[in-house]
Design a protein with these regions (language model features):
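Small/aliphatic-rich secondary-structure junction motif
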Residues: 1-52, 150-209, 229-236
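Gly/Ser-rich helix-loop-strand patches that form or flank binding pockets
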Residues: 2, 11, 15, 25-26, ...
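Structured loop/turn residues at secondary-structure junctions
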Residues: 8, 86, 112, 141, ...
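Aromatic/hydrophobic pocket-lining residues that form π-stacking "cages" and hydrophobic walls in ligand
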Residues: 20, 70, 94, 128, ...
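Structural beta-alpha unit
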Residues: 22, 54-57, 72-106, 229-239
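General small-molecule cofactor/ligand-binding pocket signal
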Residues: 34-36, 82-86, 137, 183-185, ...
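A short acidic, glycine-rich active-site loop
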Residues: 53-65, 206-222
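Fold-core signature of tandem repeat domains
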Residues: 166, 223-224
Length: 239
């Protein structure tokens, strides 16, 4: 498994490292982890005032300031990683690097150093989400799970995307720990206020509560039908 972990020295990227460390015993020896730092380029006017070698040393020094504490932390956890830094737009470069590896998983915080407090996701995370086709795990600014076994929610709607999510989770079950619990989640339509107009345009009585529940159950069953065989074959009983 190849994992790409973009870091910027923020508490959010520290949580990404903590999550990786919490999964280390589960990922196995074949896992490859790359730490990636993406630096903003110096303004063109400033860059023209120094030689290319000096400019590269500046970028290397800036990247090392971020790599050093991350490297120290992971080494203490017995985790070996590779490192890479790139200069450019963070979202664009993270997506490009994930494609180049190719990464089986990108792990990053929901925000970084430059995020605005009012955003649900930071601009870089949103940008990566919009650009990449690689699986992306977005971590909130909370401590890494202490227990090996995780509770995993998988949203399904009967589409190929829901099926792909289930296939990914089953292919990388070790990431979630032994004895992990898997929950299938489907959001059904709200029929509570549904009425049926008659030919004269008059509204007939709304659906009964039992009819609404029956319709919602049917939607749910249809949404999980494509993934039932996959789960059964893997010996996973979803909740």
């Amino acid at each position: 498994m190849k994992i790409l972990v973009p870091i910027d020295g923020s508490s959010y990227s520290e949580n990404s490292l903590a999550f990786v460390a919490s999964r280390a015993t589960l990922l196995g020896t074949a896992t490859e982890i790359e730490l990636l730092v993406v630096l903003d380029p110096l303004p063109a006017r400033a860059a023209r005032l120094v030689s290319k070698d000096s400019l590269m040393r500046y970028y290397e020094d800036e990247a090392e300031k971020i790599f050093k504490p991350a490297r120290k932390y992971l080494k203490a956890q017995g985790i070996e990683v590779t490192e890479a830094f790139i200069v450019g737009d963070p979202a664009e470069k993270i997506a490009e690097e994930a494609s180049r590896l190719p990464a089986d998983l990108i792990i990053m915080g929901s925000r970084g150093r430059t995020a605005l407090a009012g955003l649900f996701l930071g601009s870089v995370t949103n940008g990566v989400l919009a650009r990449t086709k690689n699986p992306l795990l977005i971590l909130r600014n909370k401590p890494a799970p202490e227990a090996d076994a995780m509770r995993v929610g998988i949203c399904v709607d009967g589409s190929k995307f829901g099926t792909a999510a289930v296939k990914y989770a089953l292919r990388h079950k070790e990431l979630f720990g032994k004895g992990a619990s898997f929950y299938l989640i489907n959001v059904t339509s709200d029929y509570a206020g549904a009425v049926m107009p008659d030919m004269a345009g008059m509204a007939l009585p709304a659906l009964s509560e039992s009819e609404v529940i029956e319709l919602q159950k049917k939607e749910f069953d249809e949404s999980i039908e494509p993934v039932r065989p996959l789960l059964a074959k893997a010996g996973v009983a979803p909740k």
